[in-house]
Structure formats: structure tokens, C-alpha cells
Amino acid sequence: MHMNIIVVKNYEEASQKAFEIIKSLVIEKPDANLGLATGSTPIRLYELMCEDHRVNKTSYKDVNTFNLDEYYGLKHDHPQSYYHFMHEHLFKHIDIKKENVHIPIGEGHIEEDCKRYNQLLSNNKRDIQLLGLGSNGHIGFNEPGTSFDTSTHYIALKESTIKDNAALFFNGDLDAVPKSAITMGIHNIMESKHILLIACGKRKAEAVKGMIEGEVTEELPASILQRHPHVTVIIDEEAASLLTK
């Protein structure tokens, strides 16, 4: 197994560590392909990237970004769309070019859009793919039971994911949460050169244990990362609390 597991004290330290890895890539390779994630986990990392850009002038002008997923049925300008999230938390605060930002389209012709995104991904292998981890072990919106062979696809979200997202972003309103999404498939994720996964908090401990110590199974999508040649897992003490090794 090629997992480099880094256990830190808390979320702040996890974000700092992830930031150091991303910054050193961007300095070493100014036209890097970055795979980005949304949700609550990367928010502090993006703040650190914005602060660093402002203070140290680290440039993203030649960087290309590829987001994991987008809710289906939300327009770009919807305040809960991942397009909006990325602009608010990162893109509008750094010098990235608009044409270098790639996010799945959450409306319109599903098949065509998935095909186009797959083409884009196979032409642009990510130097680093950032991932969070769902409490049910999902990566991107690849829910338990998703085939490891999938590329970008439309998916109906599991109830546990809808509940998690309602609590985090929709003031607990289950009805307001989109019930489906377009997501990079597990095959696309596994094509990345380096995978950087961050997981913090007790809620993630069970999924972390399964991902690192469990068997590789489609019932826990993140377990496939055991088969990737270069994975860095950054977890805080709470998320690491069930690990036995």
C-alpha cells in the first residue's frame, strides 16, 4: 500500500499541511493541473491559498483546475452551486484565468456533458487531486455501490449524503438539497498522479478506518485508494481515532 498517512492535531493543522503540498507543486510546476473539491473540508485550505496569494504573490495564472462534482439542477449562479462555492472561496481571490477553470455542468444534456468532461480529464491528468471523505466513505459523489470503473456520470445521492449536506449548507432543510449530481468517476480520480485526501472529525473516523485498514470494496468507495501508487491522507486525531495500526 502506498498511502502516506499524516496524523495532525486538528483541522487547522490538516489545512496547513495540505496547503504546503499544493503550494510546493504550484511553485515547482506553474502550469499544474489541480483537481479540486468542495464541501466544508477544503474551506480553510482555500483561505490559506488566498492569503498566500495576497501576501506572497504565489501565482495561479497558468494553473488549470478540474472540480470533482456539481449538483444537478442548479444554475451556476445559485448560491449553493459548487461553481458559486469555488468562485466565492477561491477563484475570485487569486489570479487564475477563467478559461482554466473546469467544473462539471449541472444542467442540460447529461450524456454530452459527461462525455466532454471525461475527454477533458483524460487529456489533462491531474498532478494533484484533492479529496474530502463522506461519512459513508464516498469520494466525489461516488456513493457506496458505485463501480470502480466509472468515469464522469450522473448519480442519485444517498440519504446519508443528503442529510450531511442539509446540515452543512442548507440549514438542515432536506427539501432544499439537490438529490442528484454529476461527478468525476472513480476511474477518473484514480488517473490522478497524486491524491491528497483530508478528513477531520469523529464523524469521519469509521470511513477513515475502512479506507485504510478495511478490504477494498465498492461498498466503501474510498477503499480503492489503497490501490493507487501515490496517496497522501491527512487526518486529525479524531478522524484517526479508530485506526489500530
Regions from the PLM with identified roles:
Residues 184-187, 191-245:
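ATP/nucleoside-binding phosphotransfer catalytic cores, i.e., glycine-rich phosphate-binding loops
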Residues 48-59, 82, 144-153, 214-216:
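A glycine- and small-aliphatic-rich helix-loop capping segment at beta-alpha/alpha-beta transitions
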Residues 1-34:
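N-terminal glycine-/serine-/threonine-rich phosphate-binding loop
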Residues 32, 40-41, 45, 120-147:
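A glycine-rich beta-strand to alpha-helix segment
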Residues 35-39, 67, 104, 130-133, ...:
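Short beta-strand segments
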Residues 28-54:
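Glycine-rich N-terminal segment of FAD-binding domains in flavoprotein oxidoreductases
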Residues 1-2, 58-129:
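Ligand-binding beta-strand-loop-alpha-helix segment within the catalytic cores
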Residues 140-186:
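Class I SAM-dependent methyltransferase SAM-binding "motif I" and its flanking Rossmann-like core
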